[in-house]
A protein has these predicted regions:
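A conserved beta-turn-beta hairpin within the catalytic core of GNAT-like acetyltransferases
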Residues: 78-87, 96, 145-147
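A short, internal acetyl-CoA/4′-phosphopantetheine-binding micro-motif in the GNAT/acyltransferase core
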Residues: 88-97, 125
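Conserved acetyl-CoA-binding loop-helix of GNAT-fold acetyltransferases
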Residues: 97-112, 119-121, 133, 137
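Short alpha-helical
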Residues: 17-21, 82, 126-130
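A short beta-loop-alpha structural element at the N-terminal edge
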Residues: 9-24
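Acetyl-CoA-dependent GNAT
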Residues: 28, 36-84, 92
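Terminal substrate-recognition subdomain of acyl/acetyltransferases
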Residues: 1-7, 123-215
Length: 215
């Protein structure tokens, strides 16, 4: 689902071969945004380790792109307890309070429900009013725990329609990523055998799908 958003931006899924885009986005976060995302001050070295492909293998990530640059992201991780998952959002300062978090969380909830998740947990600092307001928008139950707030959002139940929606969205997202134009509709390439465009597309596909990412 290549969804148009504010100022020509769009939300789509990130694939395993695009972890470098996620790393660069996290490194661009200012000090306050980093603290909100990770629950405390973190260094560049911490982010470098956090965004290693091996560390993100179990995550499903959606991104908000503007002119091909990742400006916001939502990360979904299944928990050991059946039916539970956690989500974390990050948005670069200039794009905050612009509806980016809402668009990202909508995609996360669709993916969570289709993975049999019943409860989606979102942890934030007590002073992070913006994320708490976002969670309330999705009817979250908030509980306060020693300086932190946990939002519990009920994920929608999976249906044949929701499964088809995600499959179609993933297909469009992958095609967009292959063409390397994240904020533009996928354009048709020449289909002549051995064309430079086709070889470039095939190489990009191989890079995007380095490991199985179809969870």
């Amino acid at each position: 689902m290549h969804e148009p958003l504010i100022s020509g931006g769009a939300v789509r899924r990130l694939w395993v071969g695009e972890t470098e885009l996620y790393r660069q986005h996290l490194l661009r976060l200012d000090a306050e945004s980093r603290r909100s995302r990770f629950g405390g001050a973190v260094s560049d070295a911490f982010i470098e380790r956090y965004a290693e492909p091996s560390a993100l293998r179990d995550a499903v990530i959606y991104g908000f792109f503007v002119d091909g640059v990742l400006r916001g992201a939502a990360e979904l991780r299944l928990l050991a307890r059946a039916g539970e998952a956690e989500a974390a959002l990050s948005v670069e300062r200039v794009w905050q309070s612009c509806g980016v978090g809402t668009a990202l969380l909508e995609r996360v909830l669709l993916a969570a429900g289709n993975r049999q998740v019943k409860h989606l947990h979102m942890l934030c600092l007590a002073e992070n009013r913006r994320l708490q307001q976002l969670a309330r928008k999705f009817d979250a139950e908030l509980s306060f725990r020693s300086g932190s707030v946990v939002g519990d959002v009920k994920a929608p139940r999976p249906t044949p329609i929701s499964m088809v929606r995600e499959l179609m969205a993933d297909g469009t997202d992958l095609a967009t990523a292959m063409l390397d134009v994240p904020t533009q509709p996928a354009k048709r390439l020449e289909h002549s055998n051995g064309s430079p465009e086709r070889r470039t597309r095939e190489r990009r596909y191989e890079r995007l799908m380095l490991v199985d990412n179809w969870r």
